[in-house]
Structure formats: structure tokens, C-alpha cells
Amino acid sequence: MKKTKILVIDDELDMRTFLSTLFETSGYKPLLAADGVEGLQKAREAKPALMILDVMMPKEGGVQLYRDLKSDPATKHIPVIMLSGIAKKTFFHSQNLLNQYTGKSLPEPEAYIEKPPESDELLAITEKILRAKRGNLPNV
């Protein structure tokens, strides 16, 4: 059986290793990227079922990468879980400001989890999002 691909985009090696191990031992196929530029390329090439995206990264940060992903016809359908040390309220405030500034409103990510993530919570949210995607049900 083909394993479901999950793209993890995070600049912290320890976090990529943790998430890769968590997803691999849970039956998924983790794909890894260390920054937004690499992440966007892998998202386009690998077409993962789900992306885990850190907010604060070098080269292209998670906020800009999220906007790029959701503006690209090839990747806009891929669900995203934002994972960050930044408070959820702060992230959504910045998204709203960018939406107003650019005049382009984008959908909110399927989930936002503050670091460090609890394994059980992350896996439960991941499965819920993937189940909804398979059944074309509303997201989390």
C-alpha cells in the first residue's frame, strides 16, 4: 500500500527529525525541507497530501510560503498545518494585515499548532485533515 506523503518544512533540524520520526512510525511517508524555497519546490514536485509548515524560517518564511502555496494552482488544494513558536493570535493578525495590504484574501490554514507540538494532538489533527480530504468533507 502506498504511504501518504507529508511534507515537513522547518529550518530546525531537531524539529524535522522529530516530525520525520513521528510520521514515519505512524505509517506516513515524511518528506523534508529546510526552508521555504526548498519547501515550495518539493510541494510542486512531490504533491504531498499534507504540509506541516513552520512560520519563522530563513530565505522564505512560513507566512510568505503559505501565501505562495495558496496562490499557486498546483499547490493551493494541499492542506497546511502551521507549526510555530509564534502565538496563534499573532500569526492570524499578521495574515489579516497582509490580506488587507495586498487586497488578496487567502483561506486560513487547516490547523495551527504552537511549538513544541504534542505528538498525540498533531497525529489526531493530521488524521482528521487527511480523512476530510479523502472524503471531501469540511476541514478541521
Locations of regions flagged by a protein language model:
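Charged docking surfaces used in two-component/phosphorelay signaling
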Residues: 17-25
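Active-site residues of response regulator receiver
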Residues: 10, 54, 84
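Acidic catalytic/metal-coordinating carboxylates
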Residues: 35-38, 61-67
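Active-site beta3 strand of CheY-like receiver
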Residues: 46-52
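The feature encodes the CheY-like receiver
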Residues: 16, 57-59, 67, 76, ...
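Short hydrophobic/Thr-rich beta-strand motif most characteristic of the beta2 strand and flanking loop
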Residues: 27-34, 42
